[in-house]
Amino acid sequence: MNIKILKILVGGLFFLSLNAHLWGKQDNSFLGIGERAYKSGNYSKAASYFKKACNDGVSEGCTQLGIIYENGQGTRIDYKKALEYYKTACQADDREGCFGLGGLYDEGLGTAQNYQEAIDAYAKACVLKHPESCYNLGIIYDRKIKGNAAQAVTYYQKSCNFDMAKGCYILGTAYEKGFLEVKQSNHKAVIYYLKACRLNEGQACRALGSLFENGDAGLDEDFEVAFDYLQKACALNNSGGCASLGSMYMLGRYVKKDPQKAFNYFKQACDMGSAVSCSRMGFMYSQGDTVSKDLRKALDNYERGCDMGDEVGCFALAGMYYNMKDKENAIMIYDKGCKLGMKQACENLTKLRGY
């Protein structure tokens, strides 16, 4: 889950922000010794010294203990102990402790799920300028407690102000689509997408590419700018960016036609979960113009696309099964393509069923 992954990263890097070196001298406080033990992977020793620090009123030690117990580092996972230590740290105004506490209430770990308690903890951390907590408040008001769109926008904005790329991206999407009760504005969408893309949010770079490609950014169409943003999106492992580049090279749209480059981008996108790109690879293998003709690979890639919800992939896959005299699988896959909204799949399904 995203919150837990984020906390593991926080745990791994936490000591870096707490380094208490002075004039090159080693920090021999309980916290300092604990940090060095944690860094070296000696979690039992780290926990021992973090506990001493926590007992001495050093809130960072309490937070680090919470992280250790939550993630089961050198000990079994114990969410109740994690909750206890996060709560102690948060009461001492430690923002990471409040963030950890909010996460446990948010997820219902070690306690009953309680959005109000999560909100209280995240809100305190947000006031203490913790970007992820502001963002998580936005998520709660946006997706978990309905009817709070204005609050969601407020906290997404705070997270964006603290350079949380995902918060900026969501605001960009809200303004582009008119979500969260904001007035639709491509101009504002571009502003938020630009910041998110600068902060290496691939989805935002992809969105910018689309806006500039289609001339929807309040500016004239600018294919060079669109191409640059799509390249950045792809480099940031955004499947949509890679898929769009593949389409450009396949069709020779705004760039010199290059089927091999198209195939390479489709493969990248497919491996990142782009259903359409998997289906396009299937087509290229079935034709054999760019890569060696390989019907087995064509079938496999159509199947990947279909499994991920691409109706064209399902239609092509069903056709291959039909040509292989496998009527049962052809019917099953045409049925799936039909349910995904492909009219021709519905027509073929009716013919095969004989009614």
Curated annotation (Swiss-Prot):
<keyword id="KW-0046">Antibiotic resistance</keyword>
<protein>
    <recommendedName>
        <fullName>Putative beta-lactamase HcpE</fullName>
        <ecNumber>3.5.2.6</ecNumber>
    </recommendedName>
</protein>
<feature type="disulfide bond">
    <location>
        <begin position="90"/>
        <end position="98"/>
    </location>
</feature>
<feature type="repeat" description="TPR 3">
    <location>
        <begin position="98"/>
        <end position="131"/>
    </location>
</feature>
<feature type="repeat" description="TPR 5">
    <location>
        <begin position="202"/>
        <end position="240"/>
    </location>
</feature>
<dbReference type="InterPro" id="IPR011990">
    <property type="entry name" value="TPR-like_helical_dom_sf"/>
</dbReference>
<dbReference type="GO" id="GO:0008800">
    <property type="term" value="F:beta-lactamase activity"/>
</dbReference>
<dbReference type="GO" id="GO:0005576">
    <property type="term" value="C:extracellular region"/>
</dbReference>
<dbReference type="GO" id="GO:0046677">
    <property type="term" value="P:response to antibiotic"/>
</dbReference>
<keyword id="KW-0732">Signal</keyword>
<feature type="disulfide bond">
    <location>
        <begin position="54"/>
        <end position="62"/>
    </location>
</feature>
<dbReference type="Pfam" id="PF13181">
    <property type="entry name" value="TPR_8"/>
</dbReference>
<keyword id="KW-0378">Hydrolase</keyword>
<feature type="disulfide bond">
    <location>
        <begin position="234"/>
        <end position="242"/>
    </location>
</feature>
<feature type="disulfide bond">
    <location>
        <begin position="160"/>
        <end position="168"/>
    </location>
</feature>
<dbReference type="Pfam" id="PF08238">
    <property type="entry name" value="Sel1"/>
</dbReference>
<feature type="repeat" description="TPR 8">
    <location>
        <begin position="312"/>
        <end position="344"/>
    </location>
</feature>
<dbReference type="InterPro" id="IPR040239">
    <property type="entry name" value="HcpB-like"/>
</dbReference>
<keyword id="KW-1015">Disulfide bond</keyword>
<dbReference type="InterPro" id="IPR006597">
    <property type="entry name" value="Sel1-like"/>
</dbReference>
<feature type="disulfide bond">
    <location>
        <begin position="270"/>
        <end position="278"/>
    </location>
</feature>
<feature type="signal peptide">
    <location>
        <begin position="1"/>
        <end position="22"/>
    </location>
</feature>
<keyword id="KW-0802">TPR repeat</keyword>
<feature type="disulfide bond">
    <location>
        <begin position="197"/>
        <end position="205"/>
    </location>
</feature>
<feature type="repeat" description="TPR 4">
    <location>
        <begin position="132"/>
        <end position="166"/>
    </location>
</feature>
<keyword id="KW-0677">Repeat</keyword>
<dbReference type="InterPro" id="IPR019734">
    <property type="entry name" value="TPR_rpt"/>
</dbReference>
<feature type="repeat" description="TPR 1">
    <location>
        <begin position="27"/>
        <end position="60"/>
    </location>
</feature>
<comment type="similarity">
    <text>Belongs to the hcp beta-lactamase family.</text>
</comment>
<feature type="disulfide bond">
    <location>
        <begin position="338"/>
        <end position="346"/>
    </location>
</feature>
<feature type="repeat" description="TPR 6">
    <location>
        <begin position="245"/>
        <end position="275"/>
    </location>
</feature>
<feature type="disulfide bond">
    <location>
        <begin position="126"/>
        <end position="134"/>
    </location>
</feature>
<feature type="repeat" description="TPR 2">
    <location>
        <begin position="63"/>
        <end position="96"/>
    </location>
</feature>
<feature type="repeat" description="TPR 7">
    <location>
        <begin position="276"/>
        <end position="311"/>
    </location>
</feature>
<keyword id="KW-0964">Secreted</keyword>
<feature type="disulfide bond">
    <location>
        <begin position="306"/>
        <end position="314"/>
    </location>
</feature>
<comment type="function">
    <text>May hydrolyze 6-aminopenicillinic acid and 7-aminocephalosporanic acid (ACA) derivatives.</text>
</comment>
